[in-house]
Amino acid sequence: MTPLNIVAQAKAKGLQLIAVTDHNSTLQGPVVRQVCEREGIAVIYGAEITTREEVHCLAYVGSEEQRVELQHYLEKHLPHVPNNPDIFGYQLWVDEHEQVLGEAPYLLISAIDQGIEQVAAFVHSI
């Protein structure tokens, strides 16, 4: 779902706050925030992180700086398994006009090489 669609759905449902939690990525967060601000909706950055135990945990952060730190952590610990768009689809991030800004080179559904305790400790430290 694109940022414009996410925000349109949130607005249609009367939501005042949403969280952006893509699989092992925070790259779409800033654009969702930009679109939300125009619509008067608050947004929390985050990610759905798949740990080495295959636990899917939600991590939330409060600032752009923390989002960037979380993104670097995810990039460092995500296995470099190339994405095959024919099987898993394209992993794109877009701007507020839905123009493609980039494509994640690695499969974002993979588990990172960190356990749930390590993920929790990192998120609490930032």
Q: What is the meaning of each model-derived region?
A:
Residues 1-53:
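An N-terminally biased module of ancient metal coordination in phosphate/nucleic-acid-related enzymes
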Residues 31-126:
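Extended substrate/RNA-proximal surfaces in nucleic-acid metabolism proteins
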